Amino acid sequence: MNGVLQVTFIVILSVEFIIGIFGNGFIAVVNIKDLVKGRKISSVDQILTALAISRIALLWLILVSWWIFVLYPGQWMTDRRVSIMHSIWTTFNQSSLWFATSLSIFYFFKIANFSNPIFLYLKVRLKKVMIGTLIMSLILFCLNIIIMNAPENILITEYNVSMSYSLILNNTQLSMLFPFANTMFGFIPFAVSLVTFVLLVFSLWKHQRKMQHSAHGCRDASTKAHIRALQTLIASLLLYSIFFLSHVMKVWSALLLERTLLLLITQVARTAFPSVHSWVLILGNAKMRKASLYVFLWLRCRHKE
């Protein structure tokens, strides 16, 4: 592969890592600081904090695994190490995806307006809905790990019986199995986020029709709340789509012999979601936006001194 392209992608990955660590670190520090001071943090801030911490761990894991792959490719390709690393990666990746999806569900129930009795029933029991979502994500995570590890155990047994060819078969099948399983289970939270976005758009459309003859101020307040949430969800879904497509590309890249460039592209695409999305959340959250402005003004004053 062209050395210039490789260096370019590595630089992009490094920038994404720095942006992601600072963005997610900022979210975590702001909320943990309030918690230490004895202030009560809201449900959305609790989700944001859990999301930020899981993404910090995920970004560090991406960086470490990538450098191990580049510097020690032979050691990286041993079946047991591949399995352990992918299991750890799946843990933080699934946590990140489901916390982001929980955030979409939270915004949907807080802002959307429907007269449907099921919606109203769930809206007044939002805390239970969020707990149920996290329990479901835990069940799906366990299934994901089982599906990834079961074929590996079979392949290792085959390797012990016939050492002549099973190692190649092992690595090839494992390289296809992990991204396929993560793509399959990653589609579920993506689909849930997409549904909440579509329903929120429909809610805004219904609201605008219903409030045409209502007071202008009330209409503007609710419409602005819908639009702010939709702006955040649009940016989130765009990054989510790139992330999901990168998993599809990784499944396809497992079939190729010369795949270094494609692996770099998919890695850059995958890292964009936990990295850039943190700043989307900061700009879309009033508390985080205010805190970031305070930090910016403080840094500006320090620079002038």
Swiss-Prot record:
The chain crosses the membrane at residues 9-29, 56-76, 102-122, 129-149, 185-205, 237-257, 262-282. Pfam families: TAS2R (PF05296). GO terms for cellular component: membrane. It comes from the Eukaryota. InterPro entries: GPCR_Rhodpsn_7TM, TAS2R. Residues 30-55, 123-128, 206-236, 283-305 are cytoplasmic. It is a multi-pass membrane protein. CDD domains: 7tm_TAS2R14-like (cd15019). Residues 1-8, 77-101, 150-184, 258-261 are extracellular. Keywords: G-protein coupled receptor, Glycoprotein, Membrane, Receptor, Sensory transduction, Taste, Transducer, Transmembrane, Transmembrane helix. One of its GO terms (molecular function) is bitter taste receptor activity. Several bitter taste receptors are expressed in a single taste receptor cell. Belongs to the G-protein coupled receptor T2R family. Putative taste receptor which may play a role in the perception of bitterness. PANTHER family: TASTE RECEPTOR TYPE 2, TASTE RECEPTOR TYPE 2 MEMBER 116. This is Taste receptor type 2 member 116. The lineage of its organism: Eukaryota, Metazoa, Chordata, Craniata, Vertebrata.
